[in-house]
UniProtKB/Swiss-Prot annotation:
InterPro entries: Atg5 (IPR007239), ATG5_HBR (IPR048940), Atg5_HR (IPR042526), ATG5_UblA (IPR048939), Atg5_UblA_dom_sf (IPR042527), ATG5_UblB (IPR048318). GO terms for cellular component: Atg12-Atg5-Atg16 complex; autophagosome; mitochondria-associated endoplasmic reticulum membrane contact site; phagophore; phagophore assembly site membrane. GO terms for biological process: autophagy of mitochondrion; cellular response to nitrogen starvation; piecemeal microautophagy of the nucleus; protein transport. Conjugated with ATG12. It is a peripheral membrane protein. Involved in cytoplasm to vacuole transport (Cvt) and autophagic vesicle formation. Autophagy is essential for maintenance of amino acid levels and protein synthesis under nitrogen starvation. Required for selective autophagic degradation of the nucleus (nucleophagy). Also required for mitophagy, which eliminates defective or superfluous mitochondria in order to fulfill cellular energy requirements and prevent excess ROS production. It comes from the Eukaryota. One of its GO terms (molecular function) is Atg8-family ligase activity. This is Autophagy protein 5. It comes from Lodderomyces elongisporus (strain ATCC 11503 / CBS 2605 / JCM 1781 / NBRC 1676 / NRRL YB-4239) (Yeast). Keywords: Autophagy, Isopeptide bond, Membrane, Protein transport, Transport, Ubl conjugation. It is found in: Preautophagosomal structure membrane. There is a cross-link at K160 (Glycyl lysine isopeptide (Lys-Gly) (interchain with G-Cter in ATG12)).
Amino acid sequence: MSKLTSIEENIEIKRRLWNGSISLKIIISIVGESSEDGITNEYEYLTEGYRNAYLPTLYPNIVSYIKKLPTVAFSNNSPIWLEYEGVPLRWNLPIGVLYDHLYLPAKFTNQSTPWTLDLKIASSTLPYPSNYIVPFTYSAEDGSVNYTKSINEMLLNQLKQSCYVLNGTAKPIMQLNGPETELLCNLVITRNLKTYNFFNNKIIKQIRGIPVRIYLPNTQLVAQAAVDPHILLQDLLLERIPTLMEVSVPIIHGIDAGPLLKFQLNDIWHQFKHPDNVLYISILMP
């Protein structure tokens, strides 16, 4: 199968994917001692989350908003997290992957409404669910939670893993100096695609394997693999999820990847990889 697109089309696709976002409505329920049900006020915080970014990139602005609410006594060192239908969201996964895996199955034909999430604030009565989602272990000078440092550390670890799969060694990323590594990781927050591509290309010397994660429907199970770059998408899915192939839809960046089934993983990865250099595929049961 030939290349997916021309160079110009490839650049435009990458730009659109980089800037792709999801509308979020975050419900903030403030618990007070005066009311019978324990809830004094409920606030809505509307925002946009980049598909290929991570939930904690939104947290500093959310915290600033919470601090301005009249009924909140917010502690700087209290971490926050988001839940969907009572389940804490794993912030180390891209926002778009969470959306495609958890929300899209019920809204595939109607995605006009924002994704509604519940905000939680850690306290003595509501501990942070560190047994389920990655804890935040860094603090800023003022004692507040340093979400940015946790994101950068997580992304660096992910990049090391994908670098090893791609090159057969993690040396390319280990050879970056400290400022280069920090800049590369921070670009998910600063959103400079050109600079990200420049530094990311420095750690991709050759492609021996493609890092792929397949998220299965109605489960937390994930099929992870280092995949032959020349395998077709349909052959990969037949190999990994043979019983679901005929009754499911593969989703990449919120897009039906059915038309890509006869393309090689190498071509698909080049256009649709996330900033951690992983190709994420969510399996949807229509």
